[in-house]
Amino acid sequence: MFRLLKRACSFLLLFVIYQSFVIHHNVQRVLAYKPMVEKTLAENDTKANVDLVLAMIYTETKGGEADVMQSSESSSGQKNSITDSQASIEHGVNLLSHNLALAEEAGVDSWTAVQAYNFGTAYIDYIAEHGGQNTVDLATTYSKTVVAPSLGNTSGQTYFYYHPLALISGGKLYKNGGNIYYSREVHFNLYLIELMSLF
């Protein structure tokens, strides 16, 4: 029994070390975009900041695709239509800046603007009409009743989403319903990047 426990602990330790290495590698890849993000932000009148944009890049692609901010769908309505990281960041920053301005105008929290990057800008009005504060419960309802049906999921079909923040809340997402945990993941990744930048 002790040998089995020791083996399990060794395996767990190796897994944690490996995951730490992978996360560190991904963070360094995202940080390589920092000068590009700084330049783009300097050219825009925006409330967005470098750390937030980098956390969004980490959340979207971990810096591993040309369309680092997954800007294609909001730009052209088609996936992978942007094949240049500079164009992706420019469009992503423009959309985020627009969302932040709309959120301020509507009197809602800035994390609503971040969640709207995933759900679409109409989410800002929805939150304004439902208390002014983005929550997982409101995001879940919006995903189920607005986003998913608009993209063909009228039956409320779900799938399991393997992310620690999702697992805490049950781990399900609605098919074609966006990511209800998006703003929470970005928030978490802000701290993750900050932590991994120390090493």
Curated annotation (Swiss-Prot):
GO terms for cellular component: cell surface. Disulfide bonds: none annotated. CDD domains: CwlT-like (cd16891). Coiled coil: none annotated. It is found in: Cell surface. This is Pneumococcal vaccine antigen A homolog. The gene is pvaA.
